[in-house]
Amino acid sequence: SNPSSMELQDLIAGGRLVHTAMADLAVRLTDKEQLVGKSGWSAIGAVVGATHPEDLKSLREKYPNIFFLVPGYGAQGGKAKDVQYAFDRFGHGAIVNSSRGIMCAWKKTEDATGRNYQAAEQAEAERMRDDICRYVTIL
C-alpha cells in the first residue's frame, strides 16, 4: 500500500527479491522454532499491501501457512477484489486493515461534524466486511 515500498522490497539480494527473502526467513524461523500452532498458522506473519494483488496471490500460494496483515484497503486504493488473494480457500489467513477509511468515515456523513463518529465507523466497518465477503467465503 506504500507506493515507495518497491524501492526496498523489490531489490535483489542473494539472487532474489528482498520481500521474498524476508518471507523465506519467516518460514525458516517458523520451521526451526516450531511456531505453527494447532490452527496450522505460523506465529510469524507478513505485511502485504492490498494495492499489490499480484503479490498477495503469489505470496499466498508460496507461503500457505504465513498469516497476512493487509493494509491499504479503502482510502489507499485497495479493493475487496484485490484482498481476496490474501486468504486461503477457507477464507482464513489474513486480516484486512483500513485505518483511515474507518476512522474518517464520519467525514462522509451528512452533517460531517464528527458528533456521530461511532455510528459512522461501525457502518463503514460493516460495509467493508460485506464488500470483502462478496469475494471471500469464510468456512
Residue map of PLM features:
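Generic structural signal for well-ordered alpha-helices
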Residues: 19, 23-27, 56, 80, ...
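Short, low-complexity, polar/charged sequence segments that are solvent-exposed and flexible
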Residues: 14-18, 65-68, 87-90, 114-118
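Glycine-rich, positively charged active-site loop/lid region within alpha/beta enzyme cores that binds
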Residues: 2-10, 96-97, 101-102, 106-108
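Surface-exposed amphipathic alpha-helices with a cationic face
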Residues: 27-31, 38, 59-63, 129, ...
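A C-terminal functional module that forms or caps the active site or interfaces directly
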Residues: 46, 50-97, 101-105
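C-terminal helical cap(s) of enzyme catalytic domains, especially alpha/beta-barrels
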Residues: 83-89, 104-139
